[in-house]
Amino acid sequence: SSAASDVYKRQVDYDTVRQNHRKLLRKAYFRFHPDEEYKKFVKDNEYWLGEYTEYMSKKKSKLPESYFAFCQYYFHKQWLKLKKYANDKGIQIVGDLPFYVALDGTAFTYHKELFKVDEEGKPTVVGGCPPDAFAEDGQVWSNPVYDWEYHKKTNYEWWMNRLCHNFMLYDVLRLDHFRGFDEYYSIPYGDKTAEFGHWEKGPGMDLFRTLEKNLGKLDVIAEDLG
């Protein structure tokens, strides 16, 4: 029907996007001339942007760091324009924040002090969940585990920056693996199963009191499956 055809035309053709977006971004990047707005974005986001662009340039691509800064600049610019449009229509956007970060990522690469590591900078433990009726060996997620004592000493600065940035992008934030803030399951690094893991205390309400003190009352959804 014509109605169905109209709906189809409004949908994103992700296959075509995947095939062409990097090529078009590179073309746009080489034509781009940094302006004051771009320079302000780089300055305002220097606490994460420099590490991210260096990481992406060295590990994921042969493109220069400035290319990835350019991509982030336009993503944020377009995303916030979309968010304002939605908010003006009375629509709130819900984001999703993972509890852990990846071993192969900027946080672990540049900030080993945030995690439980040995003298060589390797994880001593990783995250997961214990054996249960659904998985007799448990689950080994292989994410580095936070050194919560360090985070507490810094008044959770890294977490405050992370959450603040996400609440700039979203109106409501779903916190994945919410129980990890209370207790998290810690598994020896290198173990293939979760059999020899154990529960450890997370930051609890201390982190959220610090969050409220810094950012005020915020809309949070607590994931309740684990």
For every predicted segment, state its role.
Residues 14-23:
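Non-ligating segments of multi-cofactor redox enzymes
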Residues 2-8:
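Short, small-residue-biased leader/transition segments that mark boundaries at the very start
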Residues 1-2, 105:
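Short linear Ser/Thr-Pro motifs
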